[in-house]
Amino acid sequence: MTVTNEIDAPPIPRLKQKYREEIIPALREEFGYTNIMQVPGLTKIVVNMGVGDAARDAKLIQGAIADLSAITGQKPKINRAKKSIAQFKLRQGQPIGASVTLRGDRMWEFLDRLLTLALPRIRDFRGLSAKQFDGNGNYTFGLTEQVMFHEIDPDKVDRQRGMDITIVTTAATDEEGRSLLRRLGFPFKED
């Protein structure tokens, strides 16, 4: 009997492999980067679900936490109010939302599911706006409901919850970030 010390590494996410093999050389050619470290890449994806109604009913935050953990496969962080605002009936420390920060392979897997499964399931989807960059190559967009993710069972949804998704890149300009995301498969509207 022979013992092998080989450990099977988990498979590389499909989008990460495409980025390494196709997108890096294409971006180097497009922008004329001399060093491979200059090529923009993805740093993290932040998925945020604000639940303003949780100020009146604290149980609503549990639904948001359950939805976010099902969608991202990671336990969300509860966002709490920084200070009390009487007009909104809000007290300091009250839970008002939940967010998840995805990095590494989980980030690539989530992005793949978002682009190939979730966005095409949106009714009357015409593409994402190409103007929502922040000036530093990061892109933020909002989704109006969580049902487009196949991890969520539409029959068990207690209420619609929207979410903000921020894709943080190492791109220095919006043009570089737009080119990176377009090559990754983001369906931007043609203006």
Curated annotation (Swiss-Prot):
Name of the protein: Large ribosomal subunit protein uL5
Keywords, sorted A to Z: Ribonucleoprotein, Ribosomal protein, RNA-binding, rRNA-binding, tRNA-binding
Cysteine pairings via disulfide bonds: none
Family membership: Belongs to the universal ribosomal protein uL5 family.
Transmembrane domains' residue ranges: none
Cellular component, GO, one term: ribonucleoprotein complex
GO biological process: translation
Role summary: This is one of the proteins that bind and probably mediate the attachment of the 5S RNA into the large ribosomal subunit, where it forms part of the central protuberance. In the 70S ribosome it contacts protein S13 of the 30S subunit (bridge B1b), connecting the 2 subunits; this bridge is implicated in subunit movement. Contacts the P site tRNA; the 5S rRNA and some of its associated proteins might help stabilize positioning of ribosome-bound tRNAs.
Record Gene3D superfamilies: 3.30.1440.10
Domain of life: Bacteria
Quaternary structure annotation from Swiss-Prot or TrEMBL: Part of the 50S ribosomal subunit; part of the 5S rRNA/L5/L18/L25 subcomplex. Contacts the 5S rRNA and the P site tRNA. Forms a bridge to the 30S subunit in the 70S ribosome.
Gene responsible for this protein: rplE
GO molecular function, one term: tRNA binding
Protein species of origin: Thermobifida fusca (strain YX)
